[in-house]
């Protein structure tokens, strides 16, 4: 009988697939899925999997079976088109030949850059730098895809600006810097990951989205159990608890406890990080000091002298890249939108925040701003909600100036130690509860905890937040809304697999595109950390945070234009 079984595999597969399609047809919407439905779905997909495993010929590659593809509300045609456009915009160049040995991968120690023109460089112009990537054999690379970042800086002036890297897909790159101050400026170039390492990161993002796992504690009386949770759970013949948000359709599932009901969940927490994610071959591309965040040096001079702008009126040069701002004398100077102000005393901050309500939503990088204001403005008194440390929610009230500060973390996934399930809120739902107005300031930061997931998961979350922001601005157009971008951080061989700057850069590109054209202010944390001399950290150092807060306060309390005398 066994020797005839393979020829019936297509029949059994078709039969199982028909049952699956019937089940999907009978489910009218995601919100109506209950625990029993989801569990049945799991068991049915498991049946399909077991049938397919009878013939290796039917499985040409190793698949990551999970529930991810079937979660979330169906996007509209317009949303699907936008998602397709966004994914194309972050498509990364791939090596023409995969599986090359380490010695043929990018070696920052043997790569170099050259400054194109050291002649008459003046403020208002630009600097072009050519980068030539070589492998460990000293041979020129023939393809692109290396992840490089660069800055131009003058230590004596505490000045710095980010550069734009252009990949020519042949092993060569061009970096453009705007020239924004006079003096001797030095080029600093870093290879964060080789193109070969990026291919590994792409695989992990698509195939191992549950490499950070979460858990929830369930309790009733003296009985307690913990189970794994995620929006993407590995297929198991085990019942699920469905915690999909009814307003947004954002999916979240936990395996059902063996002895308790789903409504006995009391918290959410980070479970941990998966180990042994890489093959021996892949691990070669993640070596600290060798090919992770290693500087690339110049083949000649590494600095230029920038002269003051010419007093003679000349045709304005077309710049290849215009950054959002730059540092000068340690202060961030935006290039558009607002005149920067320095709020160096609690008195200045108090005057600016008089009568204001600041609502901060998101991850720990925006919680930093809440903590900065609470620490530097003693008039703010915190309410004790007995919240877990570094989790929140937090609230500070300034009775003297009638001001309010609030911080709340975003909904799952979030890698905090322990969050009460009653406090798990989605940003879009919170925004819908705000009245808004000229006294309301909203600050949002959501990026770091999505680095391990396929990009469509992040797009879906931002889509809900964007809709809520639009609704808020329609209710009260005078509401100020700030969106914080992601930033660079410290990396090693292990953290690169979960928190790589490449993941953050991909999400950052998506975030900027999705909020472009809306009446929101972007706090460019990416450029503010790249242009600064401090080492990269997930939580930037105090003077960077100070510049970020000053940027926000400069928008809340802009410099008043002097009226012209008639």
From Swiss-Prot:
It is found in: Secreted. GO terms for biological process: nervous system development. Its main location: secreted. Keywords: Glycoprotein, Secreted, Signal. One of its GO terms (cellular component) is extracellular region. Coiled coil: none annotated. SUPFAM superfamilies: E set domains (SSF81296). Glycans are attached at residues 64, 172, 242, 303, 344. It comes from the Eukaryota. It holds the Pfam family NXPE4_C. The keyword Signal applies. Residues 1-32 form the signal peptide. PANTHER family: NXPE FAMILY MEMBER (PTHR16165), NXPE FAMILY MEMBER 3 (PTHR16165:SF9). Belongs to the NXPE family. This is NXPE family member 3.
